[in-house]
Amino acid sequence: MNTTTLTQQHRTAAANPSLGTLTTAVGIYGAYFALAAIYFWFGGMKFTQYEAEGLVPLVSNSPLLGWVYELFSVRTFSSMLGVLEVSIGLLIAGRLLSPKLSLVGGALSAGLFVTTLSFMFSTPGVIEPSLGFPAISVAPGQFLLKDLGLLALSIFVAGHSLTRLETR
């Protein structure tokens, strides 16, 4: 199938949207909105003492990030992470202006979720000892596992944004 045929199909679908096409469009815009909202909320919470202290067991046991508390206080690191997360949210929301912004936001988001998923292997208490593997605790196990879905969503946002840039 050549590019002209794909373009014609896209125009036909846009002129005569089916329920599936409309549902997909709502899902795509919903994905951007949801991921940006999550970053604004989570990022904003990083400026609180409550959230800063909640990060300590995750970060301090991580071979990737365990060193940060030697350089920064718990509150400072949390605030820096908050700035990063709010910035990622702004970049993803920036899809309204340019797919270049959401491409960067999606890529940064994917990197952040790969990092947080690594905590599944370094944080004590992920496996529920009374049930054994593969049972995981509510916290931190299930709390961290949800990042697998957010990683997939981040990759989708980056890929969708890149596709939009390629088809301009």
Please identify what each model-predicted range represents.
Residues 2-168:
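Membrane-interface extramembranous regions
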